[in-house]
Amino acid sequence: LRNSPTFFYSIQGIYEVSLTKPLGIIFEEIEVGKGVFVQDFVEGGLAERQGKIQKGDVLVAVTAVKIVGAKWERRLIPARTFNFDTAVGAIGSNEAKWGCNDVILMFERPGESNPEAVNTFFDFFEPPFDNPWKQQQ
Protein backbone atom coordinates (compact mmCIF):
# COMPACT_ATOMS: atom_id res chain seq x y z
CA LEU A 1 0.00 0.00 0.00
CA ARG A 2 2.93 2.36 0.61
CA ASN A 3 3.91 2.09 -3.07
CA SER A 4 0.75 3.82 -4.28
CA PRO A 5 -0.27 7.41 -3.57
CA THR A 6 -2.89 7.89 -0.93
CA PHE A 7 -4.71 10.77 0.68
CA PHE A 8 -3.88 9.45 4.15
CA TYR A 9 -0.20 10.24 4.34
CA SER A 10 1.71 13.32 3.36
CA ILE A 11 4.81 13.60 1.25
CA GLN A 12 7.83 15.04 3.03
CA GLY A 13 8.66 18.54 1.84
CA ILE A 14 5.21 19.15 0.32
CA TYR A 15 2.72 21.51 1.92
CA GLU A 16 -0.62 23.06 1.04
CA VAL A 17 -1.85 26.62 1.48
CA SER A 18 -5.19 28.25 0.84
CA LEU A 19 -5.06 31.90 -0.19
CA THR A 20 -7.58 34.42 -1.46
CA LYS A 21 -6.73 36.48 -4.53
CA PRO A 22 -4.64 38.49 -5.04
CA LEU A 23 -2.12 35.96 -3.72
CA GLY A 24 0.83 38.33 -3.47
CA ILE A 25 3.24 35.81 -5.04
CA ILE A 26 5.68 36.57 -7.84
CA PHE A 27 6.23 33.37 -9.82
CA GLU A 28 9.04 32.72 -12.27
CA GLU A 29 9.37 29.90 -14.76
CA ILE A 30 12.17 27.45 -13.89
CA GLU A 31 12.70 26.36 -17.50
CA VAL A 32 10.47 24.94 -20.21
CA GLY A 33 8.57 21.93 -18.86
CA LYS A 34 9.95 22.28 -15.31
CA GLY A 35 7.24 24.42 -13.71
CA VAL A 36 7.33 27.66 -11.75
CA PHE A 37 8.80 28.70 -8.43
CA VAL A 38 8.25 31.51 -5.94
CA GLN A 39 10.70 34.20 -7.01
CA ASP A 40 9.46 36.85 -4.57
CA PHE A 41 6.44 38.28 -2.78
CA VAL A 42 4.46 41.45 -3.24
CA GLU A 43 5.49 43.58 -0.28
CA GLY A 44 2.74 43.44 2.34
CA GLY A 45 0.76 40.94 0.23
CA LEU A 46 -1.21 38.02 1.58
CA ALA A 47 1.42 35.31 0.99
CA GLU A 48 4.10 37.39 2.70
CA ARG A 49 1.83 38.12 5.66
CA GLN A 50 0.80 34.46 6.00
CA GLY A 51 4.48 33.48 6.21
CA LYS A 52 4.21 29.81 5.21
CA ILE A 53 5.55 30.06 1.64
CA GLN A 54 9.27 30.69 1.10
CA LYS A 55 11.18 32.08 -1.85
CA GLY A 56 12.38 29.17 -3.98
CA ASP A 57 9.39 26.92 -3.23
CA VAL A 58 8.12 25.14 -6.36
CA LEU A 59 4.42 25.06 -7.29
CA VAL A 60 3.47 21.38 -7.69
CA ALA A 61 -0.35 21.52 -7.75
CA VAL A 62 -3.12 24.11 -7.86
CA THR A 63 -6.89 24.16 -7.97
CA ALA A 64 -8.32 25.09 -11.35
CA VAL A 65 -11.80 25.48 -12.77
CA LYS A 66 -12.69 23.71 -16.01
CA ILE A 67 -15.80 24.83 -17.90
CA VAL A 68 -17.57 22.45 -20.27
CA GLY A 69 -20.77 23.80 -21.78
CA ALA A 70 -23.02 24.95 -18.95
CA LYS A 71 -21.16 22.92 -16.31
CA TRP A 72 -17.95 23.56 -14.43
CA GLU A 73 -15.75 21.65 -12.03
CA ARG A 74 -12.91 22.59 -9.74
CA ARG A 75 -10.12 20.15 -9.08
CA LEU A 76 -6.58 20.02 -7.82
CA ILE A 77 -4.28 19.43 -10.79
CA PRO A 78 -0.53 18.76 -10.96
CA ALA A 79 1.45 21.85 -11.97
CA ARG A 80 5.04 20.51 -12.02
CA THR A 81 5.35 20.98 -15.80
CA PHE A 82 3.30 24.18 -16.17
CA ASN A 83 4.82 27.17 -17.89
CA PHE A 84 4.26 30.62 -16.38
CA ASP A 85 1.14 31.44 -18.42
CA THR A 86 -0.50 28.09 -17.68
CA ALA A 87 0.16 28.42 -13.94
CA VAL A 88 -1.25 31.95 -13.86
CA GLY A 89 -4.26 30.85 -15.94
CA ALA A 90 -5.03 27.97 -13.58
CA ILE A 91 -4.77 30.26 -10.53
CA GLY A 92 -6.92 32.90 -12.24
CA SER A 93 -9.66 30.38 -13.03
CA ASN A 94 -10.57 30.18 -9.33
CA GLU A 95 -13.21 32.92 -9.55
CA ALA A 96 -15.93 33.92 -7.11
CA LYS A 97 -18.57 33.48 -9.85
CA TRP A 98 -17.81 29.73 -9.68
CA GLY A 99 -18.08 29.73 -5.89
CA CYS A 100 -14.31 29.78 -5.39
CA ASN A 101 -13.37 31.98 -2.47
CA ASP A 102 -9.77 30.80 -2.41
CA VAL A 103 -7.00 29.14 -4.40
CA ILE A 104 -5.46 25.96 -3.01
CA LEU A 105 -1.79 25.64 -3.87
CA MET A 106 0.66 22.84 -3.09
CA PHE A 107 4.34 23.63 -2.94
CA GLU A 108 7.52 21.58 -2.80
CA ARG A 109 10.33 22.90 -0.65
CA PRO A 110 13.62 22.04 -2.41
CA GLY A 111 16.10 20.31 -0.14
CA GLU A 112 13.35 18.96 2.13
CA SER A 113 11.58 16.68 -0.34
CA ASN A 114 12.25 13.48 -2.24
CA PRO A 115 11.56 14.45 -5.88
CA GLU A 116 10.96 10.81 -6.91
CA ALA A 117 8.29 10.35 -4.22
CA VAL A 118 6.72 13.67 -5.19
CA ASN A 119 6.57 12.65 -8.87
CA THR A 120 4.99 9.29 -8.00
CA PHE A 121 2.41 10.99 -5.79
CA PHE A 122 1.42 13.54 -8.44
CA ASP A 123 1.32 11.00 -11.27
CA PHE A 124 -1.79 9.74 -9.47
CA PHE A 125 -3.44 13.14 -10.02
CA GLU A 126 -2.45 13.55 -13.67
CA PRO A 127 -5.28 15.46 -15.37
CA PRO A 128 -7.32 13.83 -18.11
CA PHE A 129 -6.39 14.46 -21.74
CA ASP A 130 -9.24 16.96 -22.19
CA ASN A 131 -8.16 19.18 -19.28
CA PRO A 132 -7.57 22.73 -20.56
CA TRP A 133 -4.50 23.06 -18.33
CA LYS A 134 -2.85 19.86 -19.53
CA GLN A 135 0.28 20.87 -21.40
CA GLN A 136 0.69 19.61 -24.94
CA GLN A 137 3.80 17.43 -25.13
Residue ranges, per PLM feature:
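Intrinsically disordered, Ser/Thr/Pro/Gly-rich linkers and terminal tails that flank
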Residues: L1-Q137
